[in-house]
């Protein structure tokens, strides 16, 4: 039986010999992987990718002629608050010399590419610059210290030729530091539109910014409508700002970017962001994920709601916290890691779309002098083989250290390809494209104690099993291990780099073995699928007429049927059909959440649940209600006649709880909502305390939404 299984594996996984450790030359992903779902052209799905987050300024100076001059620049990079010279040409150089390809990286997440302020800012006697990219002034121009538009286009083109996607950081929450009373401070938060001044923070007569002071982060509302530190906070309920950011992101999409990382999503109205995402998906849909900072692995209701309802994924801080606690800080054990995976799978509708990571530019690096290299290598192996889209912070493969800003943003120390961390990444990263169990699979714990975790990823008939022993001094005897691996002998994909061993399976029962101290091993089986099996649908929402990409296995070559709920889509509405990918037009059905299924050769696939169909083009509307007094424990909610307002439900799909502290004060309440454009809405507010509902009286309120821009509708409680 194993000989047959082995033939299937060799015939369906082009990279098998590479994964087993043979010295095949590394080819770009576009050359190795023939499946459509794994191609660099698949901008809607990053499940088969490994992201490499790079601080552009800190990576490599490929063009010294574009470096800043004077006090803003330190070519030695000893002053980490100044520019160090890294640019897009430096990235191009490392793409061309195959550093990223040899590492196994298939997506680069670069610093925000837009023009930042040129002024330096003195904080506590230290000169600060916008090297990080988060002090924008013009979202329609490039940061000249990174390169020109031509340079950026060259970066995208060069990356694509090597099978590498480009993700841009994007920060529509704010412009740059400003002081209300001092127009000479920095650049007064001024916003420009391709060189033309839109407005500054002081004397903001057009209401482009919020002027509510700095946030103390005590509530979600406080963090949204007040300034993030001293950054000039943009008012997304202003039609000019709304249009500006829809136009600005389209400019970068038209340059060919493949993904967007949205900064500070916790600090912008969810309703505006959903309307913005709808405009992106209607233009050129790309994988988008946001930053919602969490300080622990504990569930957060607002974070979960955003991940499930906003139209974008999130950086998975719950995953990050659990991994750091277990592997870096020794403050919890493998049971906590397993619990995190179980809890997040239950909480996040599309858990495989959340972006996993072990460190980034806003926290201490994983590696310190007190953290053994093996713990870093194990954390990398876990992240690369776990659910979600893995992101590796630049320099991790070189064991770069640094606690806090700016030390966690140091200069790339070397480009060695011989470190163990580099080796671990390069061996495991290709699994995401060769074995769909890693890209799309479910997760099941198979063996566990405080220090050892053995888990299985499974998709269809494809399987991967990963064993990690974080105890660096004590081996563990593994008995009674049962998996879905077919009968046969399986070699460690890592080739023993982390002291892993081979195993033998007999009908899924694994012969007893000893997992060495500090060992990590990965065993995998890849099989072809004859049954249609959906792994991913992207984007996660869209309006009728948008094209959606369905990825998976076993769809066959003959065009079948796609179902949105019970609505069948056939014929020309299916724009392409391949064994691993289908592109289909969303049918003209009512807005709401739908299960997507595929029928091929008379066989129905699994259901991919919670795909959101919008009622049409979206606009952001602020709903305000006056004189809504409440008793202790009561909050104000909104519902109405479209799915975006909950279709008259008082349950989880209703809107709220409304806010009443910053833009308006109690007993006036407000909330920003993404609703269909150019449509007459009917709606009502209600009070809710647990299961107790109190509706306002009178007839339904009505409001016709604008066809573009934003609006505010204000009513009195009746």
From Swiss-Prot:
User: Where is the stretch described as D?
Assistant: 529-614
- Name the principal localization, coarsely classed: secreted
Q: Which residues form the IPT/TIG domain?
A: 532-612
- Enumerate the active-site residues: 263, 291
Q: Where is this region: A1?
A: 35-172
Check the record and name the InterPro entries matching this protein.
Answer: A-amylase/branching_C, A-amylase_C, Alpha_amylase, Carb-bd-like_fold, CBM20, Glyco_hydro_13_cat_dom, Glyco_hydro_b, Glycoside_hydrolase_SF
Where in this protein does the record put region E?
615-718
Q: Where is this region: B?
A: 173-236
GO cellular component assignments: extracellular region
Query: GO MF terms on file?
Result: alpha-amylase activity; cyclomaltodextrin glucanotransferase activity; metal ion binding; starch binding
Where is the signal peptide, in residue numbers?
1-34
Task: Spell out the disulfide connections.
Answer: 77-84
Tell me where it resides: Secreted
Q: How is the cofactor bound?
A: Binds 2 calcium ions per subunit.
Annotated CBM20 domain ranges read: 613-718
Please name one Pfam family that this protein belongs to. TIG
Provide the domain comment. Answer: May consist of two protein domains: the one in the N-terminal side cleaves the alpha-1,4-glucosidic bond in starch, and the other in the C-terminal side catalyzes other activities, including the reconstitution of an alpha-1,4-glucosidic linkage for cyclizing the maltooligosaccharide produced.
Oligomer and partners = Monomer.
Tell me what this protein is called: Cyclomaltodextrin glucanotransferase
Q: Tell me the gene name.
A: cgtA
């Amino acid at each position: 039986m194993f000989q047959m299984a082995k033939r299937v594996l060799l015939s369906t996984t082009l990279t098998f010999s590479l994964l087993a450790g043979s010295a095949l030359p590394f080819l770009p992903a576009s050359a190795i992987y023939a499946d459509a779902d794994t191609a660099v052209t698949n901008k809607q799905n990053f499940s088969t990718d490994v992201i490499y987050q790079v601080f552009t300024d800190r990576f490599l100076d490929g063009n010294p002629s574009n470096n800043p001059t004077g006090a803003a620049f330190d070519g030695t990079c000893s002053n980490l608050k100044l520019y160090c010279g890294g640019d897009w040409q430096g990235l191009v150089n490392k793409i061309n010399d195959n550093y990223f390809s040899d590492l196994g990286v298939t997506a680069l997440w670069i610093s925000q590419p837009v023009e930042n302020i040129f002024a330096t800012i003195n904080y506590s006697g230290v000169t600060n610059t916008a090297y990080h990219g988060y002090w924008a002034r013009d979202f329609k121009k490039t940061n000249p210290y990174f390169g020109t538009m031509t340079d950026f286009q060259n970066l995208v083109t060069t990356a694509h030729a090597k099978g590498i996607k480009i993700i841009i950081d994007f920060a529509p929450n704010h412009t740059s530091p400003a002081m209300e009373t001092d127009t000479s401070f920095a650049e007064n938060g001024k916003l420009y539109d391709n060189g033309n001044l839109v407005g500054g923070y002081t004397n903001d007569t057009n209401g482009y910014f919020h002027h509510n002071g700095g946030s103390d982060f005590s509530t979600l509302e406080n963090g949204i409508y007040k300034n993030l530190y001293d950054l000039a906070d943009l008012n997304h309920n202003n039609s000019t700002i709304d249009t500006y950011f829809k136009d600005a992101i389209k400019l970068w999409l038209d340059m060919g970017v493949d993904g967007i990382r949205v900064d500070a999503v916790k600090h912008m109205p969810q309703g505006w962001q959903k309307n913005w995402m709808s405009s992106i998906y209607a233009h050129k849909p790309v994988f988008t994920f946001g930053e919602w900072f969490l300080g622990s692995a504990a569930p957060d209701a607002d974070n979960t709601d955003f991940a499930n309802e906003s139209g974008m994924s999130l950086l998975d801080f719950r995953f990050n916290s659990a991994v750091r606690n277990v592997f870096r800080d020794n403050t919890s054990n493998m049971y906590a890691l397993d619990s995190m995976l179980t809890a997040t799978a239950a909480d996040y509708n599309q858990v495989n779309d959340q972006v996993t990571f072990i460190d980034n530019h806003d926290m201490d690096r994983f590696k310190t002098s007190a953290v053994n290299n093996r713990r870093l290598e194990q954390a990398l192996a876990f992240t690369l083989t776990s659910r979600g889209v893995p992101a590796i912070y630049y320099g991790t493969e070189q064991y770069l250290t640094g606690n806090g800003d700016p030390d966690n943003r140091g200069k790339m120390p070397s480009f060695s390809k011989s470190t163990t961390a580099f080796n671990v990444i390069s061996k495991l990263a290709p699994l995401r494209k060769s074995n769909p169990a890693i890209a799309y699979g479910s997760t099941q714990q198979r063996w566990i104690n405080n220090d050892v975790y053995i888990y299985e990823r499974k998709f269809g008939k494809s399987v991967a099993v990963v064993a990690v022993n974080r105890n660096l001094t004590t081996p563990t005897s593994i008995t009674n291990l049962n998996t879905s691996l077919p009968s046969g002998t399986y070699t460690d994909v890592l080739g023993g780099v982390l002291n892993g061993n081979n195993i033998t399976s007999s009908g899924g029962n694994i012969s007893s073995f000893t997992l060495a101290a500090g060992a990590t091993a990965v065993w995998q089986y890849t099989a072809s699928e004859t049954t249609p099996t959906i792994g991913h649908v992207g984007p996660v929402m869209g309006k009728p007429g948008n094209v959606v990409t369905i990825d998976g296995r076993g769809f066959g070559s003959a065009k079948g049927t796609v179902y949105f709920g019970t609505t069948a889509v056939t014929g020309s509405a299916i724009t392409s059909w391949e064994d691993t990918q289908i592109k289909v037009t969303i049918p003209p059905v009512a807005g709401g959440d739908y299960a997507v299924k595929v029928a091929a050769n008379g066989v129905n696939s699994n259901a991919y649940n919670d795909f959101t169909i919008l009622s049409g083009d979206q606009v952001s509307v602020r709903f305000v209600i006056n004189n809504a007094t409440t008793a202790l424990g009561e909050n104000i909610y909104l519902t109405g006649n479209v799915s975006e307002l909950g279709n008259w439900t008082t349950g989880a799909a209703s809107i709220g709880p409304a806010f009443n502290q910053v833009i308006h004060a109690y007993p006036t309440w407000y909330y920003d909502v993404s609703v269909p454009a150019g449509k007459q809405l009917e709606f009502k507010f209600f009070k809710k305390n647990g299961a107790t509902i109190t509706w306002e009286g009178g007839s339904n309120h009505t409001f016709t939404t604008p066809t573009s821009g934003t609006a505010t509708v204000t009513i009195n409680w009746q």
